[in-house]
Amino acid sequence: MSQISAKDVKDLRDTTGIGMMDCKKALEETGGDMEKAIEYLRKKGAALAAKRAEKDASEGMICIRVSADRKSGVILELNCETDFVARGEVFTGFAGALGDLALENRTVSTDALLKLRMADAMGGELVDDAIKTMTGKLGEKIDLKRLFFFDAADGLVESYVHPGAQLGAIIHLATDKPEAVAPLAKDLAMQVAAAAPIEVDRSAVPQELIAKESEIYRQQALGQGKKEEFVDKIVLGRLDKYYQEVVLLEQSFIKSNNMKVSAVLDEFRKLLQAAVDVKEFVRYQLGE
């Protein structure tokens, strides 16, 4: 068996980020061949990934990346098994690298991201293989759960990540004055994170959801002994309150409860003499 030096072990650890004892074992198993040792560790990571495939990976973080010109952005959720790992530099650095890669390649799905290659500084593997390697390194199941890419050629993208990175939101505003509208976009991203709307306006709320809510309100009213002739009016009133909870434009603005988001947008349009419209948003909360 070849003599394994401390320097060889350190070099392998620096290259892979895997613990010293595992690196020593890999070098011993491969006769001190650095390339074979790296491959050995990758295979070990893949085996561990397969072993932990059924484990529950409900911890992790929300990662958002927005381009310097605010014309594109991406939000993703990367999961692991424990909060301890989720807060570590290795995991957060890996999530950030995935976010950078997804933004750079304008990646629109997790499947597409898994087929891309990591930067050389992150090992140069395909993302799918890098996740298996990361599983071996951290000893936990690592799972790329979801991803959404924004293209805002007609305006700007802005985002907000709550401290702890368990909640994040990203929003696309169409506007002809993106620089002036940027502070409002930031506020609205925070609004989406805090108030959890499901759609931009009430016309986008799915009809099946409206029907479900209406039936619940109807049965509640009848159960409270309300007369049949008044029930429809009661249902409409409660639907209005429902819209104020789940529709972004009808919510109270996070920085002024006296104004709806729609009124804030109208005010900005007049003040800036600019077109400003919310096109879409995505809100991710860890584990949803």
From Swiss-Prot:
Sorted UniProt keywords: Cytoplasm, Elongation factor, Protein biosynthesis
Pfam families assigned to the protein according to its UniProt record, in alphabetical order: EF_TS (PF00889)
Annotated region (Involved in Mg(2+) ion dislocation from EF-Tu), positions in chain: 82-85
Compartment(s) of residence: Cytoplasm
Main location: cytoplasm
InterPro entries registered for this protein in UniProt: EF-Ts_dimer_sf, Transl_elong_EFTs/EF1B, Transl_elong_EFTs/EF1B_dimer, Transl_elong_Ts_CS, UBA-like_sf
CDD domains named in the record: UBA_EF-Ts
Record carries keyword Cytoplasm: yes
One GO cellular component term: cytoplasm
Alphabetical list of PROSITE patterns matching this protein: EF_TS_1 (PS01126), EF_TS_2 (PS01127)
GO molecular function, one term: translation elongation factor activity
NCBIfam families referenced in this protein's UniProt entry, alphabetically: tsf (TIGR00116)
Sequence similarity: Belongs to the EF-Ts family.
Reported function: Associates with the EF-Tu.GDP complex and induces the exchange of GDP to GTP. It remains bound to the aminoacyl-tRNA.EF-Tu.GTP complex up to the GTP hydrolysis stage on the ribosome.
Name recorded for this polypeptide: Elongation factor Ts
Species this protein is from: Chlorobium luteolum (strain DSM 273 / BCRC 81028 / 2530) (Pelodictyon luteolum)
Gene transcribed to yield this protein: tsf
